[in-house]
Amino acid sequence: MNANPISQTSVSVNIQQVMKRYETREGQEILALDRTDINVNPGEFIAVVGPSGCGKSTLLSLVAGLAKVSAGRIAIDGEEIRRAHPKTGVVFQSDLLLYWRTVLDNILLPIEIKKRDRAAFVPKAEQLLEAVGLKGFGAKYPAELSGGMRQRVAICRALIQTPGLLLMDEPFGALDALTREQMIMDLQSLWLSVKNTVIFITHGIEEAVFLADRVLVMSPRPGRIDLDLTIDLPRPRTWEMHRDPKFIEYMQTVRRIFEAKGVLHQ
């Protein structure tokens, strides 16, 4: 991705004593999240890492306004969330592109849904495509793109409305190792040019430490925040930083939490 000064207004996120319960078809109650507290400052990149089933995606759905809390409060810029927030964009693990629409049409879909002036957003869509290295691909269809390229389009779609908050739910989980490595570098580059607030869900400790300003470690279900780790590493971060003793120590700190919980074993 090329550096691109796309103007964004970042937001704060305040999560207070949030709990989420589900009821199974058999009537059994499952506590997915338990008394979760998180404060995210405007422009911060937060990575949330934890084992499968710990409530990471549930947390993201609550912040996105796609589900309601069972208890507690979530606010964006001080405004309590009761539905999908207009300042929020979401990127899922699957790109969810519509195969019958071109790349440009997929990016502009949120604009059409909100009945805004499509033509006014075409230049921004093209600017985003150039920022993610897909200049000239606007007329292509999803089937003509690789998995990494489709995920770049999904990121453009999330950014087209200039969201102050970008929520990413394991966006690189379905990609091969080499593509994932490139996407991690590309995301860092784009975020440094945009500087909006990001909450990034991942299973990968390495990925979390490399990308984030802070890494939040969640316990096995019911999910709680076991560790809030500030990552004090210079930016932009290069791949060679994986060999930095400080980077390795951050990774070991997170691993020790999982080992203590029985998630990882020596």
Predicted regions and their residues:
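Conserved signature/switch motifs of ABC ATPase nucleotide-binding domains
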Residues: 140-143, 161
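Helix-to-loop junction immediately C-terminal to a conserved catalytic motif
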Residues: 64
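Conserved ABC transporter NBD signature motif
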Residues: 72-84
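Short coil-to-helix segment of the ABC ATPase nucleotide-binding domain corresponding to the Q-loop/switch region
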Residues: 101-108
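The feature captures the beta-strand-to-loop junction immediately N-terminal to the Walker
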Residues: 49-51
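A short, flexible loop at the N-terminus of ABC-type nucleotide-binding domains that lies
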Residues: 8-12, 21-35
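Catalytic Walker B motif of ABC-type/P-loop ATPase nucleotide-binding domains
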Residues: 166-169
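Conserved ABC ATPase "signature" region
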Residues: 112, 119-137, 189
